[in-house]
Structures are given as structure tokens and as C-alpha cells.
Amino acid sequence: MNEPLKHKLFSVYGQILNIKALNEAWKHVKANRGAEGVDKVTIQDFEKNLDENLDSLLKSLKEKTYKPSPVRRVYIPKKNGKMRPLGIPTIKDRIVQQALTDKLSPFFEKEVFHDNSCGFRPGRDAELAVKKIVSRLEYGYFYVYDFDIKGFFDNIPHKKLMKVLN
């Protein structure tokens, strides 16, 4: 990884080491609701002592003692009758994930993702994808590639990913 890019990515951790970033992340987590993690702490439970919980989380992040908890595994049915495993993180882990997402997303949107990619991106949806396709067809392009990598997330080489992240 080139040094300027590496610096941009790795300075993100420092950007979440403040109560404002954690509060903003908390607002997203609360709005998304969601079930409790392995610690059985609900959104309502966490909110009862919000300031104390966020301060404690911030302290652990600053002291680099924060460790994510295991996820609570549940299975949801797929259309084909099979079951899809779903990992539910704890509230505090969701807050850290959201804080990092808040800081990383603008970088990836600008520097990494292709403008024509519309899947799972803020402000982009199937309707925009169709408009982009129609625009390209009107411009003279006549091929469209649509693909779905089956089991993509299940097959990410985690050792390689962790090596890149470290």
C-alpha cells in the first residue's frame, strides 16, 4: 500500500477517539434499532447510562484495551429455504463499527469505489443503476454486465485481509 494512502486509512482510528464521534455513531445505532448481542444489552439498556457507557467505551479505545465481543449467531431463512447465518454484535461494538464507517465511507466513496457501482452505497439504489444503464445505452454502449458473487462475504480470505489491515 502506498504511504499517503496508508496514512489516510490509519489516521482514521484517531478520528474516532472523541465523544462527538461516538455520540454520532450512537445516534445511527439507536435509529437502526436491532437486537441485543451476546452481552444481552439492549438499545434501551445502553441508553439508560449513555454518558457513562460512551465515556467507558472512549476510555477503552484511547487506552487500546477495547476488544470486540463475539457476535450472537442467529439464522434467518432465505428465499430458497436454506438458512443464512447472521452475527449480531453488541451495542458497543456497533457504535465502534459505525464510528469507523462514518470516517471511512467518505474516503472509500471518493477514492476507491467506481462511480457506476450502486450496490450497498449511500444515496445509490437500483433506480439509479437503471438510469446509468439507460444513459450508457443512449451514448452508444450496448453491453451490460450484471453479476453477483455467490457467498462473497463467506469466502473473503480473512488471513489476507487482516494482513492488509495490519
What are these regions (language model features)?
Residues N2, S11-G14, L104-H158:
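Active-site-proximal segment of RNA-dependent polymerases
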Residues A31-Q44, P68-I95, V112-R124, Y145-D146:
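Short, conserved non-catalytic motifs in the polymerase core
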Residues L165:
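Carboxylate/His-rich catalytic cores and anion/metal-binding grooves
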Residues N49-E52, S56-K59:
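Intein modules and their embedded homing endonuclease domains
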Residues L17-K27, S60-M83, I91, I95-L104, ...:
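Reverse-transcriptase-like RNA-dependent polymerase core
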Residues M1-D51:
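Non-catalytic, polymerase-adjacent accessory regions of viral genome-replication enzymes
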Residues M162:
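Conserved S-adenosyl-L-methionine
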